[in-house]
């Protein structure tokens, strides 16, 4: 039963972040700014590292509504969310993963889209 | 043709989902300046694909930086050209997201509550929060009314009408939060609710009926065919007579006749010919008459008149018997003298 509640909580959290991200996207000025964007073709254990990369880049977006931007960053840092994307394997948790700078540069629109896809991927794995 | 048709139907219904297949990529070296890789050979794409390529077997896939557009969709990618490229293996990858279609929902059931409230329940093909469902219903075969999609597996009809017939159908897809599937599933098997009877009538008409119709017609056709074959086989001799008429050959019948020489042989052997083997000749009494000269005129006239009646009877009996014997010539000779 605990596992079920845990699952429901996590999925609700993920849903919340995805919705907030969409709100944020509406208020961002997509003026062609380029950001390092992690790809989705990454190893399972590098999920968390990719999320961290995204989380450090979000504040760089030019958003008119700062409140929602801060909320998104806060949620991406949350323990609950991190537990969703964490790796099961003990070995090489953050070892073999790419550094944030090594990911290709994409414009802000692509960046937000990729982050949403990453969160959706996590949600599909969960439910 | 019906056999093929029914097999095709089975194959199609067994398919879980239909996914438009990823198009083929064709790459062309343009004037030793660059490489154009396109995927619009089989028609303009209706979705945006992501293109990747790599020049070396070992190495990472690189995403396309210069997409070629047509009607607001990406149809190809322009790659930079290297002199050795024509002698290398170029590996390409075309990726499309959310090309997905679910099975339709199953186990539909309707029940009327105390309120009164008409509730529809169903099961989605997968038990996950990622699926949203859409309900449509019609009252007494009027226009379909569609609900807003929701993640519940239950739907309540607002203020149901009395003495009406409701027909329900449900379909599902992956919701937007989880990465929306491009296609809705097919509509589920319909279910009917008749407020008069207060019953759950699962409408079996539709695809299941058409399956039955196909099967029955197939069985019927095969049965008829087998029966026809059997009839033809039984009556094959008679049919042969009708279709290929026999040419009469009198030679066969008269073969034994023509072989024999004597008349006696004819009489005894041939039965079909019109000779009477039991012919007995009736003996006719013959009398000789002489003219005695007493007085010239009277005696002549008397002798002329005296024709024996017996002889005329004889003659008649002989000629009446069915024969073509040359016996009559003897009688004639006797009469004159």
Residue ranges and their predicted role:
Chain A
Residues 3-127:
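Extracellular/luminal segments of secreted precursors and ectodomains of membrane proteins
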């Amino acid at each position: 039963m605990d596992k079920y509640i845990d699952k429901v909580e996590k999925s609700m959290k993920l849903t919340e972040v995805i919705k907030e991200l969409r709100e944020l996207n509406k208020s961002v000025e997509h003026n062609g700014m380029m950001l390092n964007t992690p790809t989705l073709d990454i190893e399972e254990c590098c999920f968390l590292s990719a999320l961290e990369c995204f989380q450090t880049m979000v504040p760089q977006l030019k958003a008119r509504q700062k409140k929602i931007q801060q909320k998104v960053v806060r949620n991406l840092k949350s323990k609950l969310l991190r537990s969703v994307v964490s790796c099961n394997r003990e070995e090489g948790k953050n070892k073999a993963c790419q550094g944030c700078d090594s990911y290709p540069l994409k414009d802000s629109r692509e960046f937000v889209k990729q982050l949403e896809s990453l969160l959706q991927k996590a949600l599909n794995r969960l439910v | 043709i019906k056999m093929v048709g029914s097999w095709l139907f089975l194959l199609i219904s067994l398919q879980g989902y239909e996914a438009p297949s990823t198009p083929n990529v064709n790459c062309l070296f343009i004037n030793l300046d660059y490489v154009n890789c396109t995927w619009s050979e089989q028609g303009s794409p209706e979705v945006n694909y992501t293109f990747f390529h790599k020049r070396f077997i070992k190495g990472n896939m690189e995403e396309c930086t210069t997409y070629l557009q047509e009607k607001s969709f990406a149809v190809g990618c322009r790659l930079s050209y290297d002199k050795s490229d024509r002698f290398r293996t170029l590996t390409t990858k075309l990726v499309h997201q959310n090309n997905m279609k679910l099975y339709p929902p199953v186990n539909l059931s309707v029940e009327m509550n105390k309120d009164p409230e008409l509730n529809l329940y169903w099961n989605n093909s997968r038990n996950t929060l990622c699926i949203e469902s859409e309900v449509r219903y019609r009252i007494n075969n009027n226009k379909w009314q569609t609900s807003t999609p929701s993640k519940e597996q239950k739907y309540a009809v607002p203020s149901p009408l009395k003495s009406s017939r409701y027909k329900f159908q449900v379909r599902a897809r992956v919701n937007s939060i989880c990465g929306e599937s491009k296609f809705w599933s097919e509509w589920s098997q319909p279910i009917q609710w008749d407020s008069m009877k207060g019953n759950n009538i699962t409408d079996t008409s539709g695809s299941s009926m058409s399956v039955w119709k196909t099967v029955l017609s197939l069985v019927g056709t095969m049965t008829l065919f087998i029966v026809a074959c059997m009839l033809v086989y039984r009556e094959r001799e008679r049919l042969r007579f009708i279709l290929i008429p026999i040419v009469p050959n009198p030679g066969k019948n008269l073969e034994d006749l023509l072989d024999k020489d004597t008349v006696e042989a004819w009489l005894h052997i041939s039965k079909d010919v019109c000779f009477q083997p039991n012919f007995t000749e009736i003996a006719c009494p013959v009398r000789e008459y002489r003219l005695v000269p007493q007085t010239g005129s009277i005696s002549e006239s008397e002798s002329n008149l005296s024709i024996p009646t017996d002889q005329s009877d004889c003659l008649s009996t002989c000629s009446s018997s069915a024969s073509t014997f040359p016996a009559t010539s003897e009688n004639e000779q006797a009469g004159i003298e």
